[in-house]
């Protein structure tokens, strides 16, 4: 009895494990459902794709082939063997022939066939055309350079001629006497080293005609020799003043001055003293430049000793 009871109990446990508990319907062992099969494209779609791919590859191959074909046809270095042979014969013929046109023409007729003669004519025409182009371009460049150079020289000459300048030297025939400060009004502007251009000299003053920056300079020499007589005093103030006078706005300004007090004793046979001043100044049209000195009777009258001048450096921005 006990053995039969144990067997029955095992049977019930086995039914619970397989059926999920008492009362559960018996469905047999559980398995995962198989995955669905992938969707296969229709045969017509695959054929269309393969055809399009083939057409695309064919078009690429044809394009590449045409590119290399035309490149080979347009290659300037592509010369046939016959053409090379003709050119070689022509060059050999001209090397061995005399420098007479009649000899060359007769040998061309006898030794060069018609096909090579056509190549020669085409080659000569191309060379002649290229030479004409080179000679013509060089001729045009030479003419252009000549024209440009002429205009440039003319412009330079015109600019130099129009550049204002003046160099004035002392007129020894009209030098004031005395020891006091005086204005020097007697200058040469067209004699010896004196010259003036595009500026005006009037009443002992240099008049500016063009606005601009000018360099002004003055060199004044004083001298005395014992044969000229005794000096009134042994202590002398030897000075020079460069003055600017404006007419539009009445005014006068000293631009530069220089000098010194000297002791000229009667024990010396000869005395000499030189003053030089210079500088850049902005001047307007109509302004006047003049020179003032002390002890004018002691001025050195040589043109390389007493002078003043001006020249324009640049325009006013």
Swiss-Prot record:
Cytoplasmic topological intervals: 1-47
Q: Which residues are glycosylated?
A: 171, 198
| Chain spans, region Disordered | 1-43
Briefly describe its induction.
Up-regulated by T-cell receptor stimulation.
Please give the Gene Ontology molecular function terms for this protein. cytokine activity; identical protein binding; tumor necrosis factor receptor binding
User: What's in the keyword line of the UniProt record?
Assistant: Cell membrane, Cytokine, Cytoplasm, Developmental protein, Differentiation, Disease variant, Glycoprotein, Membrane, Osteopetrosis, Receptor, Secreted, Signal-anchor, Transmembrane, Transmembrane helix
Limits of the THD domain: 164-313
Biased-composition ranges, Basic and acidic residues, are: 1-16
Pfam families noted in UniProt: TNF
* Residues the UniProt record annotates as site (Cleavage): 139-140
The protein's PTM annotation reads:
The soluble form of isoform 1 derives from the membrane form by proteolytic processing. The cleavage may be catalyzed by ADAM17.
Side of membrane Extracellular, spans: 69-317
Q: Which SMART domains match?
A: TNF (SM00207)
- From which residue to which does any coiled coil extend? none
Q: Which GO biological process categories is it annotated with?
A: bone resorption; calcium ion homeostasis; calcium-mediated signaling; cell surface receptor signaling pathway; cellular response to leukemia inhibitory factor; cytokine-mediated signaling pathway; immune response; JNK cascade
Give the UniProt tissue specificity note. Answer: Highest in the peripheral lymph nodes, weak in spleen, peripheral blood Leukocytes, bone marrow, heart, placenta, skeletal muscle, stomach and thyroid.
SUPFAM superfamilies from the xrefs? TNF-like
An example of a Gene Ontology cellular component annotation for this protein is:
plasma membrane
Q: Where are the transmembrane segments?
A: 48-68
Biased amino acid composition, Pro residues: 31-41
PROSITE patterns from the UniProt entry: THD_2
Main function: Cytokine that binds to TNFRSF11B/OPG and to TNFRSF11A/RANK. Osteoclast differentiation and activation factor. Augments the ability of dendritic cells to stimulate naive T-cell proliferation. May be an important regulator of interactions between T-cells and dendritic cells and may play a role in the regulation of the T-cell-dependent immune response. May also play an important role in enhanced bone-resorption in humoral hypercalcemia of malignancy.
What family is reported? Answer: Belongs to the tumor necrosis factor family.
Spell out the subunit comment. Homotrimer. Interacts with TNFRSF11B. Interacts with TNFRSF11A. Interacts with FBN1 (via N-terminal domain) in a Ca(+2)-dependent manner. Interacts with TNFAIP6 (via both Link and CUB domains).
Describe the disease involvement stated in the record for this chain.
Answer: Osteopetrosis, autosomal recessive 2: A rare genetic disease characterized by abnormally dense bone, due to defective resorption of immature bone. Osteopetrosis occurs in two forms: a severe autosomal recessive form occurring in utero, infancy, or childhood, and a benign autosomal dominant form occurring in adolescence or adulthood. Recessive osteopetrosis commonly manifests in early infancy with macrocephaly, feeding difficulties, evolving blindness and deafness, bone marrow failure, severe anemia, and hepatosplenomegaly.
The protein depicted here goes by the name Tumor necrosis factor ligand superfamily member 11
**Native species of this protein?**
Homo sapiens
